[in-house]
Amino acid sequence: MYPVDLHMHTVASTHAYSTLSDYIAQAKRKGIKLFSITDHGPDMADAPHHWHFINMRIWPRIVDGVGILRGIEANIKNTEGEIDCFGQMYDSLDLIIAGFHEPVFAPHDKATNTQAMIATIASGNVHIISHPGNPKYPIDIMAVAEAAAKHQVALEINNSSFIHSRKGSEDNCRAVAAAVRDAGGWIALGSDSHTAYTLGEFDEALKIIEAVDFPEDRILNVSPARMLGFLESRGMTPIAEFAEL
């Protein structure tokens, strides 16, 4: 098990069922040292108001030895790469994930989906693209991987895509992992937990990256230091409290 999980949802996204405290408790039990809460961006029907993300600045950085990153899973809105993260939200957030979600950006043809994803990557506003292997949104995988490597954006292998949602993602995700490997980019693993009990569960995602011999030194979840170093390379001010992780 890797000690970092970068994608999960709380009751603030009302189709999820756990609180921040629930995740902290599970992290302690499972040996997770750092995680990011990434509730859905405000353009989703059941997402929190944008004030929710602004006020994440009041969260403690560490609770009982577990580090907490303040994140969002924003929605890619259009082919210009616009996402539903704006204004003061950026000041409070450490980690910005963005991806396609049908209520906000309906599936299009391969060229349109690719244009939207690459524009989002090139915007400089996003750290990770969530579930890029979703078969409902065909993309030019190599073009996306090369853009992601160029702009220091990680592509996610989402464990939930093989269990609960986005059925048929396996082949695309293997292709994503292989393309990122060849482009020299970063992979992020995400449990995409909607209940704290699945925090840190990457078993199916690990099968994907192992199948393509993906190098461990390009996986963000290997340690808190690696993930924090990645964020700092993207401009995040070092967070003093995390030095003890």
Swiss-Prot record:
rRNA processing keyword on record: no
GO cellular component, one term: cytosol
Pfam families on file: PHP (PF02811)
Keyword Endoplasmic reticulum belongs to the record: no
Binding site for Zn(2+) 2: 15, 40, 194
GO BP annotations listed: bacterial-type flagellum-dependent swarming motility
Keyword entries, A-Z: Hydrolase, Metal-binding, Zinc
Database matches in InterPro entries: Phosphatase_YcdX_put, PHP_dom, PHP_phosphatase, Pol/His_phosphatase_N, Pol/histidinol_Pase-like
CDD domains with a match to the protein in the record: PHP_HisPPase_Ycdx_like
List of residues binding Zn(2+) 3: 73, 101, 131
Comment on bound cofactor: Binds 3 Zn(2+) ions per subunit.
Residues bound to Zn(2+) 1: 7, 9, 73, 192
One Gene Ontology molecular-function label: zinc ion binding
EC number per UniProt: 3.1.3.-
Leading EC class: hydrolase
SMART domains linked: POLIIIAc (SM00481)
Cofactor: Zn(2+)
Family assignment from sequence similarity: Belongs to the PHP family.
Subunit note: Homotrimer.
Name this polypeptide is given: Probable phosphatase YcdX
Protein's organism: Escherichia fergusonii (strain ATCC 35469 / DSM 13698 / CCUG 18766 / IAM 14443 / JCM 21226 / LMG 7866 / NBRC 102419 / NCTC 12128 / CDC 0568-73)
Gene encoding the protein: ycdX
